[in-house]
Amino acid sequence: MENNKKVLKKMVFFVLVTFLGLTISQEVFAQQDPDPSQLHRSSLVKNLQNIYFLYEGDPVTHENVKSVDQLLSHDLIYNVSGPNYDKLKTELKNQEMATLFKDKNVDIYGVEYYHLCYLCENAERSACIYGGVTNHEGNHLEIPKKIVVKVSIDGIQSLSFDIETNKKMVTAQELDYKVRKYLTDNKQLYTNGPSKYETGYIKFIPKNKESFWFDFFPEPEFTQSKYLMIYKDNETLDSNTSQIEVYLTTK
């Protein structure tokens, strides 16, 4: 009888430890939302219109292209052209990531910058991005996937809208651009002047990875190239299972 009690106690202890372990691991797995003090305030930002120019215009988009060169071990250069460039460089977080995409057929979707963009001495018409690369083969959907974006303003769920992608695995950069573009065109997130919002961020919630977020506003003294480094990790999400939320506060 005494042995049975000991066995029962061990079983109960094991179940409790397992439950607590799962609970703790889930809490660690989910990234916390930013504290208000972590977010940059738009009213403190000089030349906020430089962010507006990034997201008001069209992004860089190219499909089924291969890299032709490298400047550094962690970047890739493509012979592709747009209205203002004839070469494009993408900078990634490290050499290992660059090697994954080097000489591969890829799709590119990125927010470009020109000031402080350096490819080589003879590259007069060049553009630069961070990340924005996905494999081309086997990554396209026959029917574009709609992703619902839920927007809270001053703590109140205020609206929702859809964005679309034709990729199975899509970069956070592509989704982020489309969300900011919609909010700029329809809700004055960015203007050629002050923003009507004081703080804001976009939160990505993948199914099998920890959530993460991007601050909508830069630090007071910023450059476009430095701000766009948020995309350097080339973070990707499953378009079929990921969720997007936006949180804004007004002035």
UniProtKB/Swiss-Prot annotation:
Pfam families: Stap_Strp_tox_C, Stap_Strp_toxin
Disulfide bonds: C117-C128
Keywords: Disulfide bond, Modulation of host virulence by virus, Signal, Toxin, Viral exotoxin, Virulence
Entry GO MF terms: toxin activity
Keyword Cell membrane found: no
Stretch forming the signal peptide: 1-30
Cellular component, GO, one term: extracellular region
A GO biological-process term: symbiont-mediated modulation of host virulence
Entries under PROSITE patterns matching the protein: STAPH_STREP_TOXIN_1 (PS00277), STAPH_STREP_TOXIN_2 (PS00278)
More info: Binds to major histocompatibility complex class II beta chain.
Similarity comment: Belongs to the staphylococcal/streptococcal toxin family.
Name of protein: Exotoxin type A
Source species of the chain: Streptococcus pyogenes phage T12 (Bacteriophage T12)
Gene name per UniProt: speA
